[in-house]
Amino acid sequence: PLCLCWALSPVAASAPPNLLFLLMDDMGWGDLGAFGEPSKETPNLDQMASEGMLFLDFYTANPLCSPSRAALLTGRLPVRNGFYTTNAHARNAYTPQDIVGGIPDSELLLPELLKKAGYTNKIIGKWHLGHRPQFHPLKHGFDEWFGSPNCHFGPFDNRALPNIPVYRDWEMIGRYYEDFKIDLKTGEANLTQIYLQEALDFISKQQASQQPFFLYWAIDATHAPVYASKRFLGTSQRGLYGDAVREIDDSIGKILNHLQKLGISENTFVFFTSDNGAALISAPKQGGSNGRFLCGKQTTFEGGMREPAIAWWPGHIPAGGVSHQLGNVMDLFSTGLSLAGLQPPSDRQIDGIDLLPAILQGKLIDRPIFYYRGNEMMAVRVGLYKAHYWTWSNSWEEYSKGIDFCPGQNVSGVTTHTQEEHTTLPLLFHLGRDPGEKYPLSFASDEYQRAMERISLVVQRHRATMVPGEPQLNVCDRAVMNWSPPGCEKLGKCLTPPKSDPKKCFWPH
């Protein structure tokens, strides 16, 4: 008989695996013992790394929360999927309560596509792709949701503005600080435990139903104001931030253990990473570590965009692997589709690549990393070389008020406080010799000339295919805040919105 095996990938030939993406919030490269954090307070994540594959060169698509999450779920750079602003040059923008925009219907999200392969999809935690009804995650491929549309950082003490709602599926079931308490004095909150239980219950339910699942566990305990439950408070050598990390580590250990107990660990692909670098401006009490890398969240230096990353899939990924593959959160889109036996959409530019050859066979795929800030490509990495076409940390005005994205790390001529253009002669670093981006190569050197010849071609090709999407993060209006989310009437928690008054959003950095 004729063999039809060629039509199927080795993965898709059997039942497609479950997908579990563990996305941290503002956790840095230097926060895990496996990446060299000296207090070694992440035993479960370190064990996950020893049983799976550690990625040393894994990046986010943007140094801020919302654009990074939009990139992960669409496989596309934020400048393509609309998660950027044109209100000013090279500005970070996200989805606060008063944002009018969100994820466009024209974008295809990973869970929408996974439905074609019979997956049930759940998001637990922070959505951050728009909070208005048309942007609801259940309208974009998810079947279940427990979590919040925005970050938990406020308003919490301002009676004139609504607190952020917490949803179960279509309707709100309460609000942060009112029904879901976060004690800002002690840092106590039970949210990570609630998110853990949600994950365990969903996994058990799906295992019983024999249907493949995609679980996107996007928790936010390490985003300021950081929090931990009572049992973990005061247990870390790293203060409250370390307490939050310890609780997350413990929770991930319980989730992986649950998969093993149910006998489905060999059929569940798990990937751990973070949405952007640690927020050094909040450190050390409310922020983490980016290890040896320069600066942090909000910047396109390595500390803002290089992330901790671990792939775990017992029986498939060889234990103890360390990969130097250049990876990006957008690759989770393409890799997830590949695992499900699906092709990425062919009617649009997809920036994510399928990492399975790197993960399962140790092959290195030649690909660049682009570092965007708002509407500007600030830098590009090709191989071990990184070229900065623009540099900026933040303005002198902000810096003089104590807003510092590179505390104790400022490098003259590199971490500039005015936007400096280097497009004629980019600043070039060899990240193997100089991971801290402190010593630019001499413009006159042969090494500079050779590297820039290669990089210039990559940038030229990239710019030729770059068609920016309609910017979603330009318009703000207090009338669209979470005044009366669906379900508020049942709880008696509806608030009256003010008159609509749309304005250009102000993005200072």
Model regions: which residues?
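Formylglycine-dependent sulfatase
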Residues: 1-426, 435-474, 478-509
